[in-house]
Amino acid sequence: MDWSFFRVVAMLFIFLVVVEVNSEFRIQVRDYNTKNGTIKWHSIRRQKREWIKFAAACREGEDNSKRNPIAKIHSDCAANQQVTYRISGVGIDQPPYGIFVINQKTGEINITSIVDREVTPFFIIYCRALNSMGQDLERPLELRVRVLDINDNPPVFSMATFAGQIEENSNANTLVMILNATDADEPNNLNSKIAFKIIRQEPSDSPMFIINRNTGEIRTMNNFLDREQYGQYALAVRGSDRDGGADGMSAECECNIKILDVNDNIPYMEQSSYTIEIQENTLNSNLLEIRVIDLDEEFSANWMAVIFFISGNEGNWFEIEMNERTNVGILKVVKPLDYEAMQSLQLSIGVRNKAEFHHSIMSQYKLKASAISVTVLNVIEGPVFRPGSKTYVVTGNMGSNDKVGDFVATDLDTGRPSTTVRYVMGNNPADLLAVDSRTGKLTLKNKVTKEQYNMLGGKYQGTILSIDDNLQRTCTGTININIQSFGNDDRTNTEPNTKITTNTGRQESTSSTNYDTSTTSTDSSQVYSSEPGNGAKDLLSDNVHFGPAGIGLLIMGFLVLGLVPFLMICCDCGGAPRSAAGFEPVPECSDGAIHSWAVEGPQPEPRDITTVIPQIPPDNANIIECIDNSGVYTNEYGGREMQDLGGGERMTGFELTEGVKTSGMPEICQEYSGTLRRNSMRECREGGLNMNFMESYFCQKAYAYADEDEGRPSNDCLLIYDIEGVGSPAGSVGCCSFIGEDLDDSFLDTLGPKFKKLADISLGKESYPDLDPSWPPQSTEPVCLPQETEPVVSGHPPISPHFGTTTVISESTYPSGPGVLHPKPILDPLGYGNVTVTESYTTSDTLKPSVHVHDNRPASNVVVTERVVGPISGADLHGMLEMPDLRDGSNVIVTERVIAPSSSLPTSLTIHHPRESSNVVVTERVIQPTSGMIGSLSMHPELANAHNVIVTERVVSGAGVTGISGTTGISGGIGSSGLVGTSMGAGSGALSGAGISGGGIGLSSLGGTASIGHMRSSSDHHFNQTIGSASPSTARSRITKYSTVQYSK
């Protein structure tokens, strides 16, 4: 930015202000005369008023008259009249008086005397301009006269001697005290700025303190303060103004600093070891004096010591009492020592202070023990009674000279009963007892009478004396006797049972056959008891009561009884398993289905198969025997557990469960007969799903539905025709969206069994009569073909001589039992609409039902992929469905519900998006084992032997798809696994149930025939009908699904 322009403008503005201030303003006012119409100009000039100039400052302590006049005032009114100037204020008409005077004519103000700033730092002079009448011509003016300061005052300390204190061993830079000094000179001026300095320290060994020159704070220089070395310091501090300059004024003060004591000295005992002697059985109040030395301040808690025992005084024989005046500990004996128990003692003592140690020496403190060796001197001791009193029991049937007990004195030197003493009775109330002078045996002098009992009140207390004539010593013992009531006089005392407990804790007992008397003595009171009669019996008493445990058991019993009705409601109570009234949990991965009776007709009745018992062959057998045929599977299925038996499998369990289930793939066996049913999702109900794959599956399903809906003709909407009147009948605008719909009668397939006959008539089907029940069966049993039998590619497969002729019958007939019975429909939880069933039966007398043998390998996760759309050329499925090239290279194949274990699904199952074409092949419900997808749809080799089925249903081809008839093949053999294929469609395709050669799916294990019959021609005009679209050149084919029900006999 260019500042030159702004500089020029600023200079011009300042110049104009200066010119204006120093010049006069003249204003011309125009006066218009209305009488004569003339205009006059009057000039009005404003003159600048000069009132005063700034007053000059006065320095204190000097003669300022040379600066007179220090100020001058002037009023503009002086030009027109006479003006008198006057002043007032401090120093004029207020003390101090007469410092300032004014010339009333000229307005000059003069100073007349010396001023002191410390007395009056400034003066305020009030100036007035008066006329001759004494009236103010101007407003009063305040004139300030400032007094300049000079350094004429020294610093002054608030105290001549400052006192402070600080603990020893304090950290460096610890605040001790703050000095306070003031200066009367002008504040915030160099003349009043004080600088502090320590000029002397006592003792002066080394400087221990520092002072802040600006604030006067005294702090420690280091942490070497030691009260034991110097207890007090004296400092001399100087304060100088003008910040300590040489021309400044100064003052001094004293500082006394006391060093406070802390517990930084570890106390110790004067001697490290002591040796003393003491006689046994004596007490001593001043056995030993222990002096403690501590360098801390005397009589303080840091100096007072406490002596304590570290070890050796476990019996609490000694105590130490401290003298706080001398810091001396006195060792006392408070409990007699026994020479026989111990001859010497080693005491270990330690010392500490009452106060806690300072943190500076806390880590240095280590406990130092001092040893005291105590020697116990033996003395000759007299006998004593231990314990000093004993209690006995005397019964009413005890007579004269009966023994009450023994009370002997013990020799303390040997610890045994004394043999040098004699015993005499001391206090003996009622003269009841007598004592043996040598043995100390107590006996009754006479039988206790009732009068003695009443006199003593049942309690006797006497004394016994032991006298040692050699030592001239006597010991006294106390005898306590409990006299029992005289109500027990009838008891007999034959032989006493005496049990004595001595002071050593040992029990001695003597017993006889009769338990009449028992004498007991305890350690504490030495109680001897004599119980007459059946004493042992009296000790036994019943103590039976109803406690909390019994109450708790009763409450628990009632609670269990309350749970019985609830348990009866929950359990089946012997009812049939899987009863119709119960609920069956639906697993997460189960595929729901609408049963045939959900559409029309009653629910089929379940059949009893309890008599169907499989016969288990030996473990080394390679075949599976068939089950006796006594019923037909309707709503019941059997769960089986299998074992591998080499080439075949052995069934180890059989369970009857009500429900609907389809059979799996038949096993390779030497003979097989019965009804074959398809698998269902019930077999994989317990398996989990791969959620990532399921998410992809649902996305593909949604795309397929979108593409399908886009290709379908819309109903109930206005059709768009490119050329009106061409390809559309007259009056076609209406609800009929598709001409071909008039001839579409596929909706009759879903009407149910009630309308089956009507549907057959509408479709023009040929009606076959029911079989005669008296038709004789053949006697030949069906035998499965060997595993290595080559299947036939086209045409009809060779029929085994063991089978009867193949007959196409209606859905209502079914062979079972010894004759031909009317069958119930085979229900599949996944079967919507009609299905194609291939049945093989024998002509023997007894037809056995099929045995559905499951693989004992854990079921893999099964993923259902529905409507995966892709072109045939991109999928490269010619190896699996052998069909000729279609007329359009962009043929589309729609595969619905491809069921395979998810653990082995390859990435090649994802087929590219289809292109529009006029020919469409729809394959629905393809259930393919991984072993059968060896071609372009390669699977993981670990599932090569999976026993699964492939069912292809509703194969719809366009007008150009005519080469499928009789040439359909599926590549990739299953190996040892059998397969049943059922294919339906509008084209003339066929699938051989006996087998397909060329590496196709081997069906040799079935031994029957499976054919597709009653298929409508694909040359229907429905596939040539042009669907309305936006472009006339785009042709699309409508997909019509056909399916019928056939049985091949």
Curated annotation (Swiss-Prot):
Biased composition (Low complexity): 509-530
Localisation per UniProt entry: Cell membrane; Cell junction, Desmosome; Cytoplasm; Nucleus
GO terms of molecular function: calcium ion binding; gamma-catenin binding; toxic substance binding
Main location: membrane
Residue ranges of the propeptide: 24-49
PROSITE patterns, sorted: CADHERIN_1, CADHERIN_2
Protein's membrane topology: Single-pass type I membrane protein
Keyword Cytoplasm: yes
Pfam families in alphabetical order: CADH_Y-type_LIR, Cadherin
Signal peptide span: 1-23
Gene3D superfamilies: Cadherins, TCF3-CBD (Catenin binding domain)
Function: Component of intercellular desmosome junctions. Involved in the interaction of plaque proteins and intermediate filaments mediating cell-cell adhesion.
Linked pathology: Palmoplantar keratoderma 1, striate, focal, or diffuse: A dermatological disorder characterized by thickening of the skin on the palms and soles, and longitudinal hyperkeratotic lesions on the palms, running the length of each finger. Erythroderma, congenital, with palmoplantar keratoderma, hypotrichosis, and hyper IgE: A syndrome characterized by severe dermatitis, multiple allergies and metabolic wasting. Clinical features include erythroderma, yellowish papules and plaques arranged at the periphery of the palms, along the fingers and over weight-bearing areas of the feet, skin erosions and scaling, and hypotrichosis. Additionally, patients manifest severe food allergies, elevated immunoglobulin E (IgE) levels and recurrent infections with marked metabolic wasting.
Protein name per UniProt: Desmoglein-1
